[in-house]
């Protein structure tokens, strides 16, 4: 199970939400009460974790929304393969390939032997940061 559920009113800026099947981080949120008998609405602007696209959602604050479960793990870069890197998990020792991040500063630090923090979000992998210099 890679998602859990929460009400939209409980979420804040910086929280994570699933919009159109994509995991996103909330960057802007506003709530408005509509009229005498209307329910309060929330307008959410979020950025997709994998593509960087902006997505919006307008719904009642008591609406149930999906929240992605983010598994934060540590791995070691084994090989640089162009626009992909091969990573070995430091706990399970399984190896897998991950697309390089779009951030040029982070991308330049990815070399064999470097420890990285990566996230598993809805069955997809993303590298979030480099933990230290390669061990020689």
From Swiss-Prot:
Biological role: Functions by promoting the formation of the first peptide bond.
The species this protein was found in: Hyperthermus butylicus (strain DSM 5456 / JCM 9403 / PLM1-5)
Lineage of source species: Archaea, Thermoproteota, Thermoprotei, Desulfurococcales, Pyrodictiaceae
Residue positions where Hypusine is found in the record: 36
Protein biosynthesis among keywords: yes
MF terms in GO: ribosome binding; RNA binding; translation elongation factor activity; translation initiation factor activity
Keywords: Cytoplasm, Hypusine, Initiation factor, Protein biosynthesis
GO CC terms, sorted: cytoplasm
UniProt-listed GO biological process terms: positive regulation of translational elongation; positive regulation of translational termination
Broad class of the protein's primary localization: cytoplasm
Subcellular location(s) of the protein: Cytoplasm
Leader sequence residues: none
Regions annotated as coiled coil: none
Cross-referenced InterPro entries: IF5A-like, IF5A-like_N, NA-bd_OB-fold, Rib_uL2_dom2, Trans_elong_IF5A_hypusine_site, Transl_elong_IF5A_arc, Transl_elong_IF5A_C, Translation_prot_SH3-like_sf
UniProt entry tagged with the keyword Cytoplasm: yes
Record-stated family: Belongs to the eIF-5A family.
Pfam families, per database record: eIF-5a, IF5A-like_N
Residues that span the membrane, as ranges: none
Gene that encodes it: eIF5A
Protein name per UniProt: Translation initiation factor 5A
HAMAP family: eIF_5A (MF_00085)
């Amino acid at each position: 199970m890679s998602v859990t559920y929460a009400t939209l009113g409980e979420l804040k800026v910086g929280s994570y939400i699933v919009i159109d099947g994509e995991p996103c981080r909330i960057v802007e949120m506003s709530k408005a009460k509509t009229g005498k008998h209307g329910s309060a609405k929330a307008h959410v602007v979020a950025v997709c974790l994998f593509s960087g696209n902006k997505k919006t959602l307008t719904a009642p604050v008591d609406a149930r929304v999906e929240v992605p479960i983010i598994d934060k793990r540590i791995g070691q870069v084994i090989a640089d393969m162009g626009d992909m890197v091969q990573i070995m998990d430091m706990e399970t020792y399984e190896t897998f390939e991950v697309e390089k991040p779009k951030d040029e500063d982070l991308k330049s630090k990815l070399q064999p032997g470097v420890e990285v923090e990566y996230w598993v979000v809805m069955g997809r992998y993303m590298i979030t940061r480099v933990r230290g210099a390669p061990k020689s």
